[in-house]
Amino acid sequence: MATLLSHPQQRPPFLRQAIKIRRRRVRDLQDPPPQMAPEIQPPSHHFSPEQRALLYEDALYTVLHRLGHPEPNHVTEASELLRYLQEAFHVEPEEHQQTLQRVRELEKPIFCLKATVKQAKGILGKDVSGFSDPYCLLGIEQGVGVPGGSPGSRHRQKAVVRHTIPEEETHRTQVITQTLNPVWDETFILEFEDITNASFHLDMWDLDTVESVRQKLGELTDLHGLRRIFKEARKDKGQDDFLGNVVLRLQDLRCREDQWYPLEPRTETYPDRGQCHLQFQLIHKRRATSASRSQPSYTVHLHLLQQLVSHEVTQHEAGSTSWDGSLSPQAATVLFLHATQKDLSDFHQSMAQWLAYSRLYQSLEFPSSCLLHPITSIEYQWIQGRLKAEQQEELAASFSSLLTYGLSLIRRFRSVFPLSVSDSPARLQSLLRVLVQMCKMKAFGELCPNTAPLPQLVTEALQTGTTEWFHLKQQHHQPMVQGIPEAGKALLGLVQDVIGDLHQCQRTWDKIFHNTLKIHLFSMAFRELQWLVAKRVQDHTTVVGDVVSPEMGESLFQLYISLKELCQLRMSSSERDGVLALDNFHRWFQPAIPSWLQKTYNEALARVQRAVQMDELVPLGELTKHSTSAVDLSTCFAQISHTARQLDWPDPEEAFMITVKFVEDTCRLALVYCSLIKARARELSSGQKDQGQAANMLCVVVNDMEQLRLVIGKLPAQLAWEALEQRVGAVLEQGQLQNTLHAQLQSALAGLGHEIRTGVRTLAEQLEVGIAKHIQKLVGVRESVLPEDAILPLMKFLEVELCYMNTNLVQENFSSLLTLLWTHTLTVLVEAAASQRSSSLASNRLKIALQNLEICFHAEGCGLPPKALHTATFQALQRDLELQAASSRELIRKYFCSRIQQQAETTSEELGAVTVKASYRASEQKLRVELLSASSLLPLDSNGSSDPFVQLTLEPRHEFPELAARETQKHKKDLHPLFDETFEFLVPAEPCRKAGACLLLTVLDYDTLGADDLEGEAFLPLREVPGLSGSEEPGEVPQTRLPLTYPAPNGDPILQLLEGRKGDREAQVFVRLRRHRAKQASQHALRPAP
């Protein structure tokens, strides 16, 4: 599509319409922009008044002397055609009438019928051989009409050409021998005067030559041929046979006809005589117009075509529509009549169309696809040497002109085909296709042999155009006020325009040029533009210098980011592996790094301060328990991470230091936020009398800190530490990244953890007071109140408070609070248990409270896990309360359970051992004990020996109150006595099966003067005695060897509990006995058994 309008002097070129250039001096460029290539001035499509008058005369003459029926889509009325010509030539009515009258007075042309006899098929075979030797006689009969009106209803004509048309006006074709389907393809020009009473006659004859009978019999093939011989014998010798005729009225013909006509007979004999293919064209000879007399017909038609197409395009522009290449019916009719009357060949018509369209395309706006049809027609009909020398020069000039103009459009394709217009890509692609097809033509190769290949020409045009476009953009971005900041902003705008242009080349234009010409526009444009950009950026950074202000730093950062984006386009070009001017461009920005980092921190700090100041410390919603400042802080940190990713500094060592700075600033901001948010909480709660509101704010503060800790924990992923570690692996010492970045992160997390724990500790302290009060009340409740009822106030208090905290704290902080409360609760319970050691009732309440508190803090898996609940303190308290809540007899039983366990674990016989056999006979309810012996007893007498005996008692005594203790015989001076004595105890089996039930064997050294000395004790559990574990009577009873043990010298916890129960006589008796035994054991130097 052309871009120059009809009058370059009146309307500015399209290029200057698309890009408004600011005219000002360029002072800050060291290299002036190159001189722009001059715009191609296309040849004017307007004619001089004299030329237009001659052409108008010839066009009117064509309409006035129209011949034949109109074509189906053509205009019938001459007045309409004359009116159209008046508009197309912009002729005033008066001038039109004068010219029309003058044309009417001109001499009429000689009317001619150009008849071409192409061929025939299916004609009659008149010769003996079954074939004919056909030829045609044709001419025009003047003054006699053809009856019947139309050709379809005419009667058969018995008259023949030789009888109706003078011989000098009769034309004859060649004779085609021996065929039924002759081909002539001969053309004849037949003149006539009046089309209304003229008719075309064509007779087809079979040439008859004189042959002998012998020759004819030799050609005989069947009986039908024999009949022909007899018929010819009756005919005069040398008389030709009639094959058929075609008679047409000229006024029934169109300007051009191309049809098959049936051959009509003179009689009813053989009505089907075949068909004849005829072509007709009604033409003029000796036209009286000045243009026809002075100029070749081809030239006149070319000018007429150019004038009418120009008018068609202008009419569409006036209606704000684009011409699609279709001529109006009026224009098509006039051009068809003119070409027909001038007898222009199809080739010359195509050539005229090409010359006219190629000229008009350079000055009017219409689709370049209109050029494809004449190109194709010329290529199809091209024959070398067909054109005269001047026509060849004209055609070569049109090729050269269109190629030059097309290249100028391609050079300026960014402005000529803007993407803001939807059909621009299609228009450019159409232009390229036209140029490709033109350069591939045989005519182009012969007439323009020295033209460089089209891809080379287009590539050079694109390179030049890209450079010109860059300099135009550079001028467009020149600031009104000269200065370094303004120059930086202008350069940034220029780089962004370059990036946008490259994106357009990549997405749209590259595909068009590659598919059409195999040219990679994007790679070429990237190579050219990156070099131009690199030079200007380097010059600018040099002017800025090493001291970078905050304002200049922001400008340089945006410029750096834009250059990164520009360099990333390298991967899409063919230059990805080459050396580019923008390689290592980051070095030009090194002085600006401190300014960038400081500005990033300052902006983030200001945003944090602003966010905290506007925070009302209210949760964002039911599911979001932190406040607005936490969200703003997360966004702030995300922006810092985004800035770090944008920076993505190429140098590994410097990138590491930049990352260290980012992490340091982020951690510092986190701690600053903690201080600010706590101060904000104090500010908001200072005037609050409602402690619940203060607790709410404290919960929000703690949640905000927890949210901050989660955000900080994502720093390694957001700043891509793993990728950084791989990059700096060859530069830094091993472990340096871990020691630096991770140490900073852990320090910040530790600080946040401390702040969170402090906040949670404050919340816990508010609850701990209430927990301690309820536990104290629990201990002091009346004895008549059931334990389950006594703990209700404590449990309700915890339910309300913990539900509140669970609602207002995030899960992590709520778990931390539960841990603190649980630890404190255990501490309070331990203190209460210690103060109530002597009260089994109070201890039982505490025991039940501990069980319920464990369930409460576990909360069916929603609270603390069992591992966190079952601490050492909990387990010790649980054991202590289990003991304290027990009765005296239960404690005595537990004591014996403990001694039985001690007996089972003792393997050393340093105190000696006793051997017994015990069994139980359920039928007799008798426990039978055989005390066999003792061995390795300690010598307790001064003589180095002992007088041992064994005391047997069933314990606990409250289970066996009726059974008295038994004793063995005393053995003098014997450390290995053999007792061999049997004892029977009448006792039911049930008490013997209870836990703690045992046979206590106390080995004593008999002392005549004083109290007996204790050798040791042994405990035989009764539930293990044969006969008690089952219903069967015991058989062979095994011996049991029991090492002797001492009671613990420091006292037993159970004995201490029993000792504290002063009012329980049974407990006091038991304690005195066990204390006496412990005292006896402590008098010996040997260490007691563990």
From Swiss-Prot:
**Cellular-component GO terms for this entry:** azurophil granule lumen; cytosol; exocytic vesicle; extracellular region; intracellular membrane-bounded organelle; late endosome; lysosome; membrane
Q: Which GO terms describe its biological process?
A: defense response to virus; germinal center formation; granuloma formation; natural killer cell degranulation; phagocytosis; positive regulation of exocytosis; positive regulation of regulated secretory pathway; positive regulation of substrate adhesion-dependent cell spreading
Q: Where is this region: Interaction with RAB27A?
A: 240-543
What cofactor is this protein dependent on? Ca(2+)
Give the similarity note: Belongs to the unc-13 family.
Report the protein's function: Plays a role in cytotoxic granule exocytosis in lymphocytes. Required for both granule maturation and granule docking and priming at the immunologic synapse. Regulates assembly of recycling and late endosomal structures, leading to the formation of an endosomal exocytic compartment that fuses with perforin-containing granules at the immunologic synapse and licences them for exocytosis. Regulates Ca(2+)-dependent secretory lysosome exocytosis in mast cells.
Query: What interactions and quaternary structure are annotated?
Result: Interacts with DOC2A. Interacts with RAB27A. Interacts with RHOG; the interaction increases RhoG affinity to the membrane lipids, targets UNC13D to membrane lipids and facilitates cytotoxic granule (CG) docking to the plasma membrane.
Q: What is this protein called?
A: Protein unc-13 homolog D
Q: Name the gene.
A: UNC13D
